[in-house]
C-alpha cells in the first residue's frame, strides 16, 4: 500500500521546493543551494525548479523524440548519460534517473514532457532545458542543465 506522499509523487503533484528536494534530483543533496523565493534548487551547472514557465520555446520537442545536433542524432537519454559529460570532474550533477523517472510518471498520465537545446554562444558547451508538467496544468518542473566542454574530445590512456 502506498503512502499519501508516495501517491502525490506518483501523480507528479509537486507544488514547492521541499517536494522537489524529497525527490533527490542530485547526486549529492548536501551540496545544493535552495532558493525558496523562486522554488529552485541550484547545483553545479544545473538547476531544478517548480514554476510556471514564461514560455516553452517553439524549438522544444517531445522527450521521446531524437534531436539533431552538429549532424548527429541524440536521444534525451543519451545526452543525460553522455560519457562526454561524466568524464569531467563534477562536484555535483543532476541524476539522469531523476529526469527519466519524472518523464515516465508524466507519460503514464498521457502528458508530454518537452526539451530543447539553447545556444549560449559557447561552441563547446551544451545547454539543455526540460519542461516536465505536473498535475497542475500551469506548473512545470523546469530543469536547466549546462555541460561545459561537451564537444571537446578528451582521451585518457592508462
UniProtKB/Swiss-Prot annotation:
<comment type="similarity">
    <text>Belongs to the orthopoxvirus OPG058 family.</text>
</comment>
<dbReference type="InterPro" id="IPR007675">
    <property type="entry name" value="Poxvirus_F15"/>
</dbReference>
<keyword id="KW-0244">Early protein</keyword>
<dbReference type="Pfam" id="PF04596">
    <property type="entry name" value="Pox_F15"/>
</dbReference>
<protein>
    <recommendedName>
        <fullName>Protein OPG060</fullName>
    </recommendedName>
</protein>
Amino acid at each position: 500500500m502506498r503512502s499519501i506522499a508516495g501517491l502525490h509523487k506518483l501523480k507528479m503533484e509537486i507544488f514547492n521546493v521541499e517536494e522537489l528536494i524529497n525527490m533527490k534530483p542530485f547526486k549529492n543533496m548536501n551540496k545544493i543551494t535552495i532558493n525558496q523565493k523562486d522554488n529552485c534548487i541550484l547545483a553545479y551547472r544545473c538547476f531544478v525548479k517548480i514554476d510556471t514557465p514564461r514560455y516553452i520555446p517553439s524549438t522544444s520537442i517531445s522527450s521521446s523524440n531524437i534531436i539533431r545536433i552538429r549532424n548527429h542524432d541524440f536521444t534525451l537519454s543519451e545526452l543525460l548519460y553522455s560519457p562526454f559529460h561524466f568524464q569531467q570532474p563534477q562536484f555535483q550533477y543532476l541524476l539522469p534517473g531523476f529526469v527519466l523517472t519524472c518523464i515516465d510518471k508524466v507519460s503514464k498520465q498521457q502528458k508530454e514532457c518537452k526539451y530543447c537545446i539553447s545556444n549560449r554562444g559557447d561552441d563547446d558547451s551544451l545547454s539543455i532545458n526540460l519542461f516536465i508538467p505536473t498535475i497542475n496544468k500551469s506548473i512545470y518542473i523546469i530543469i536547466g542543465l549546462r555541460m561545459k566542454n561537451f564537444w571537446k574530445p578528451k582521451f585518457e590512456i592508462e
